[in-house]
Amino acid sequence: EDGRAEALVPEDRRAWHAGAGSWQGRDDVNSRSIGIEIANPGDRPFPVTQMDAVVTLLRDIMARWQISPHGVIGHSDMAPGRKIDPGPRFDWQRLVHEGLALQGGQGPDLPLDASLTRIGYPPADPETRLAAFRLRFRPWGQGAESPADRCCAAFVAASVTRLTAAAGRAYQA
C-alpha cells in the first residue's frame, strides 16, 4: 500500500494470476494477460501513493504491449461471481481520467445482456453478470437491473466498438 511495485513474474511469462475466467469470449486469461496484484482488503479506499504506482505501471505496460484502455480489467470482470477484486473502492475513475481504462456513462437503453457480451463479460447468470458489471462501473448500484445499468453498459459497449474500429482490428489480449 506504500506504492512499491515488485515484478514477481516476467511480463512475457504466464503468471497463473487470474484463474478460471474469460474476457471477450476468450478463455485462459492467464495466457493473454499481465496481472497486477494490488494489496488492499477491498473495504477501504486505495491510498494515493498506491494508485500513483498503479498508474505508472499501467502506463508502462500498456505502451510496451500496445494494450488499449478496454484491455484494462479487474478480476471481477473476467470471473463474475468468483472474483470481486479490485472491488468497489478501487479508483477506476482515476484510471479513466489518465486514459488507462474505459468509463461507464450514459448511453441508449439497450438490453443489458447484449451490452455485457459486447464489453467482454463471460456467460453467467444475469444477476452475477450485473453484480460484476456494477463492481467496476456502477459500484453504488443496488437491487434489480435498472435503466441506469442498461444505459451505462450500452455506453461502455459503444466505447469498445469505437476503440476496436479505431485500432483497425479486434481486441487482442
Give names to the regions the model predicted.
Residues 1-70:
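Active-site-adjacent loop/helix surface patches within enzyme catalytic domains
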